[in-house]
Regions:
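Residues lining hydrophobic/aromatic ligand-binding pockets adjacent to catalytic sites
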Residues: 1-247
Length: 247
């Protein structure tokens, strides 16, 4: 994949604190408090999903910042109060608070803010306007949809015009699984398919994905959420090798 050397590849897993990774990734005897530092030796980014359930404290973000290398980047998933409960209605204050804590805590290591919408959140003009009017274009905002109605030309055009990233995904459903490349950064989530969170992708599938990234792309964030067992670790390392990423 030497043709993609100019791309800033950010490859990692959706989280790091998995007890089943003990002995298969984390060395025996390594204290759990040192797991994140060990993770950072192997990957240059992480997608934090625990923030979906409870927003981490500023102290947690500061700790992650201090424990990670200078060029490490974080993606933080927005709380479900914004995306699943309120569905962006009456959420301006919540979004501002979310932005504030991740910017303050992660500073120059903040990669993306991820907003994952539920399958019940289908496309309407009103909902598209809610997204466009509530997101701060000064940040790298990534939206992951789970309803196929969002794959339409109007959405793609508005996202491009407003510097929003439409997340590609591999998910056990009928949703399209191609990469969506009209704004930098490109963002893709491997959730496990056909078995959610579990299935290992073949090396050929990883090669096909890497080759799909168009020349001229500046930055790509790729996260493996098939974190059951070794699947995410194996696939992430395969992609790192394919992209000649030196860690």
């Amino acid at each position: 994949m030497n043709g993609n050397q100019a791309i800033d590849w950010r490859i990692g897993c959706s989280g790091y604190y998995y007890k089943e990774w003990k002995d298969i990734f984390y060395p025996a005897g390594l204290p759990q408090k040192d797991w994140f530092g060990y993770y950072c030796q192997h990957f240059n980014t992480i997608e934090i999903n625990s923030s979906f359930y409870k927003q981490p404290s500023l102290k947690s973000f500061n700790t992650w910042y201090d424990q990670s290398p200078a060029d490490f980047l974080f993606t933080i998933k927005a709380p479900r109060t914004i995306t699943h409960y309120n569905k962006f209605h009456d959420s301006a204050g919540l979004i501002t608070d979310f932005y504030q804590v991740i910017k303050t805590g992660l500073r120059d290591k903040l990669g993306c803010a991820l907003f994952q919408l539920p399958p019940s959140f289908s496309y309407t003009e009103e909902r598209l306007s809610l997204l466009l009017n509530n997101l701060d274009q000064a940040l790298k905002n990534v939206i992951e949809f789970r309803h196929i109605s969002w794959w339409n030309n109007t959405v793609m055009t508005e996202f491009k015009n407003n510097q929003l990233t439409f997340s590609g995904l591999s998910y056990p459903s009928a949703l399209p699984d191609g990469t969506i490349q009209f704004n930098n950064p490109v963002y893709y989530r491997f959730h496990g398919k056909p078995i959610l969170y579990k299935s290992l992708y073949t090396e050929q599938e990883i090669i096909t994905f890497a080759k799909s990234i168009m020349p001229g792309t500046k930055q790509v964030f790729v996260y493996f959420n098939n974190t059951w067992g070794e699947s995410a670790l194996t696939n992430a390392k395969q992609l790192i090798a394919l992209t000649d990423l030196k860690l």
